[in-house]
Amino acid sequence: MVFDAVGNPQTILLLGGTSEIGLAICERYLRNASARIVLAVMPGDPGRDAAVEQMRKAGASAVDVVDFDALDTESHPAVIDQAFAGGDVDVAIVAFGLLGDAEELWQNQRKAVQIAGVNYTAAVSVGVLLGEKMRAQGSGQIIAMSSAAGERVRRSNFVYGSTKAGLDGFYLGLGEALREFGVRVLVIRPGQVRTRMSAHVKEAPLTVDKEYVAELAVTASAKGKELVWAPGAFRYVMMVLRHIPRPIFRKLPI
């Protein structure tokens, strides 16, 4: 049995096991029912122990930790095998990523390649593996953290935005590919979220708390949605921006 009798997940895998948004989503699921949590964490991540304790306090029935280096794609099959070794995984949350300094990224080849490797290549790598596992078990929910920055890539953060555009397209397509096998994929496009990663960035309009994103993720998953914005109003903002001609778009202070 995968989900319990009322649709609550029994095992949740968080790839990016110290992600504030990812942990908030796990906490929101645990408010409904206890579950086993598997945290896939970068070796040596200083937030590892705190994340485990956070999940225990939130009501997890068990918390397992597996080492996960996003850039070491050769190790990913073993990581996913280990995560599924204890039985079916009902929900897998893809919530790892880098933000970086926008102006440095397009002028530093090493860092540009690194962020592309983490935000896009690694996301594709684990997505393929999760799809394979969940297809075999005949069920499952993947939640992929995208970004409004990928909807129309802006000059102000185009390296980061381009990686999220790629992730977004991949997971939307993966959802289409897996539909017939009983596996669902939800892509979440948040604007700015109040976390440690964005603490140094000037707060933008429509900024939301991680708890808001978590509530949206769990609710949208239960409804079988494939794509949601956080907040919902961002959808209409980006709908307008997407159709602005490039010469005009270039002059906008965004």
Curated annotation (Swiss-Prot):
Give its localization.
Periplasm
Pathway listed: Cell wall biogenesis; cell wall polysaccharide biosynthesis
Which Gene3D superfamilies did the record assign?
NAD(P)-binding Rossmann-like Domain
Q: Which reaction does it catalyse?
A: trans,octa-cis-decaprenylphospho-beta-D-arabinofuranose + NAD(+) = trans,octa-cis-decaprenylphospho-beta-D-erythro-pentofuranosid-2-ulose + NADH + H(+)
Coiled coil region boundaries:
none
Protein origin, superkingdom: Bacteria
Q: What is its main location?
A: periplasm
Q: Does the keyword GTP-binding apply?
A: no
Question: What's a GO cellular component annotated to this UniProt protein?
Answer: periplasmic space
Keywords (alphabetical) are:
Cell wall biogenesis/degradation, NAD, Oxidoreductase, Periplasm
Q: Which InterPro entries match?
A: NAD(P)-bd_dom_sf (IPR036291), Sc_DH/Rdtase_CS (IPR020904), SDR_fam (IPR002347)
* PROSITE patterns xref list: ADH_SHORT (PS00061)
Give the top-level enzyme category.
Answer: oxidoreductase
- Residues bound to NAD(+) are D67, K164
Active-site positions on this chain: Y160 (proton acceptor)
Does Glycoprotein appear among the keywords? no
Q: What's the EC number here?
A: 1.1.1.333
Its GO biological process terms? capsule polysaccharide biosynthetic process; cell wall organization
**Subunit record text:** Interacts with DprE1 to form an epimerase complex.
Q: Explain the purpose of this protein.
A: Component of the DprE1-DprE2 complex that catalyzes the 2-step epimerization of decaprenyl-phospho-ribose (DPR) to decaprenyl-phospho-arabinose (DPA), a key precursor that serves as the arabinose donor required for the synthesis of cell-wall arabinans. DprE1 catalyzes the first step of epimerization, namely FAD-dependent oxidation of the C2' hydroxyl of DPR to yield the keto intermediate decaprenyl-phospho-2'-keto-D-arabinose (DPX).
Would you identify the family this protein belongs to, as annotated? Belongs to the short-chain dehydrogenases/reductases (SDR) family.
What is the protein's given name? Decaprenylphosphoryl-2-keto-beta-D-erythro-pentose reductase
Say which species the protein is native to.
Mycolicibacterium smegmatis (strain ATCC 700084 / mc(2)155) (Mycobacterium smegmatis)
Gene field: dprE2
